Amino acid sequence: MILTEHLSKRFGPLTAVADLSLEVGSGEIVGFLGPNGAGKTTTLRLLMGFLNPSSGRCSVLGGSLLTQPHLRRRVGYLPGDFRMDSAMTGRDLFRWFSRLRGGVEQNRIDQLVERLQLDPTRPFGALSKGNRQKIGVIQAFMHDPKVLILDEPTSGLDPLIQREFLSLVREAADRGVAVLFSSHVLPEVERMASRVAIIRSGRLVTLSSVDELLDRARHRLELRFADPVPTELFRDVSGVVAHEVDGKTVVITLDGPVGPAMQVASSRPGLLRVSPASDELEDLFVTLYGGAPSEDQHA
């Protein structure tokens, strides 16, 4: 229901998305992860038809939203920076979105307003970031779309409302809705997504189920040496799919026999200790990137 094939987008000399192929099927929830400027927001805007691809193609519900904008009525989209007319109230905005989509049952809107604890009578400009985000979430869900494309959807929401949002997403997936959401909050992705697509510098680094990623996290070793270790020590070693060097400590992620890595480690004088590394998904993310996850800059 959501598809990209060798999708690329360039802005002059900058490549924001490079040869990205990804598919999200009916009832599937895919978390889209990446550090600053990774290309997540650009990918979502390409899917929505707001940008022209430089090469490759993308489709939603079997068509291009760029050339078939009527398909947007069946898509729920939440941009990363949701802005509306500051004078319009929540009710005004819901009526406006309802007209755009050919009509929405008021009962559905009222239900979402109650679940997200929103006062729809206040003007948008007078609302906090969290309450503005609630309006964004409601407009994305209120017409019961077949596809949800959500950019940092829980930004600004308090923990209680975040839990309600997760329930809305799961309910949508149970109805067969395809969900693609970007996030930098790894526990959120771990709870909600069936698969995780990790992007860096516009390229897909990995596409795995959450269970597979956690399994990879459990196949990690921490090696402690007496002296600082060259960053290239475990490069191209069979079975080592990622490595992180921090002075005298190396964390390696294995996808195969441990023997070749241990042979390299033991061949270097001063190996002091080998122990299991953390099995947290966030630590695996850091190993894949060599840096901590952070908010997208909407590249």
Model-flagged regions — what are they?
Residues 89, 209, 277-280:
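Short loop/turn segments at beta->alpha junctions
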Residues 99-102, 290-294:
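Non-catalytic alpha-helical coupling and interface elements of nucleotide-dependent molecular machines
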Residues 165-254:
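ABC transporter nucleotide-binding domain
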Residues 1-8, 291-299:
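ABC-family P-loop ATPase nucleotide-binding domain
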Residues 95, 187, 211, 263, ...:
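Active-site phosphate/pyrophosphate- and oxyanion-stabilizing loops and adjacent acidic/basic residues
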Residues 2-4, 9-200, 205-206:
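ABC transporter nucleotide-binding domains
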Residues 219-291, 299:
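Short, charged/small-residue-rich alpha-helical element at the C-terminal edge
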